[in-house]
Amino acid sequence: MSKIIDPRSFGAVADGRTLDTAALQRALDAAAPGDTVRLAGGTFRTGTLGLHGGLTLEIAPDAVLEGSPDIADYRDCGFHHLEMGQTVSLLYALGGDDLTLCGGGTIQMNGPAFMDWDFAHYCPREVDPATVTPEVREQMVCAIVKRPTQPIFLDSCRHVRVHDLTVLDAPCWTFTFSNCEDVALERVTVENHRQIPNCDGVHFSASRRIRVSDCTFLCGDDCFAATCITNPAAVCEDIVVERCRMQSRSAAIRFGHLDSTVRNAVVRDVRVERSNRCICVFAKDGGSVRDVSFERVRAETKIHAGGWWGKGEPFVVCAAESTGEISGVAIRDCDFLCENPGVVAGTNGNVRDVRIEDCSFRIEPGITHPYFVGKMDLQPNVPQLRPAPWCAGDHVWVSGAERVALRERPPAV
């Protein structure tokens, strides 16, 4: 018979000051498959915790799982990440099936504690620092000191469900699912400090059968990303994202990165607010993205100052200056209020069969627009801004791509 485990029985204090790592880990280790470790009625401050299959970690509405603001309280979990190096996490699982995180409570990660806020914020080469106003400076990237690199990290797990949680202030990628199968996120809110770099909402790498629904992601970096960064030889596929709200200083929705292979994805009924980019589909040498569709996306883009990728585009579909390939992209029945046109950019036709149908565009420049008007941002494929190529209609820039179809409709009044 499954049982409910109270970490206080293992010595947890839950006063928000005492470090409860050891007591929480004892409670988690004591849980048999089917058991629930329930955090209730307090703030449980902790460093790194290891999870295992068959476990439910329930954080009740009156409870907070608080990540320690001291990096010394975290440890390497034993996974080498190809981009971030050794993985240092708040919660992690390496292998294990039937894992659930839930409960209606809050995970507070204390991300700002790992940043240097006195650092002169990064200013891109295109901008004269003397012209930067205080309002613009507050949009720029802060500096990293030393941080947990993958706050919630699951690798090689199956049948994972995360639902009814609020996660605050991640210092880096909030959720990472690497080499996982059958993952569902439902009614999850992630709210991160927008000046912290790399604080993605949820990042799926080399995973399959993914469902993300009814979630809110407010992030400094990508809200939702699907790549193969942790395992370039694999495929990330069979993805549905629906009924979500997103805001990002980078891309709200990203498919592909460098040599990643991503396929078979649907995004629908998503609202994007004041993001550097809305939709981002990228492939570089050895990478490919195919058969992805976006339906009923309502988006507002805004150019944010600093080193953020993107310059107010409603979408960027890009395999420029590479041997990567992108095909079968459909963007349908979407409304875009943006600062720059959309971009479809390839080399010698390696981007093809892109359909933009029944979409409306309205371009309204913001305060940073004069720095970047008329230039494409193809980062990370191409490091420098490029002059705009010819336009398909007034609202889409196309270069080096084949079979790009555009059918606009007037914006809604």
Task: Show which residues each predicted segment covers.
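Extracellular/periplasmic carbohydrate-active domains that bind, remodel
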Residues: 1-413
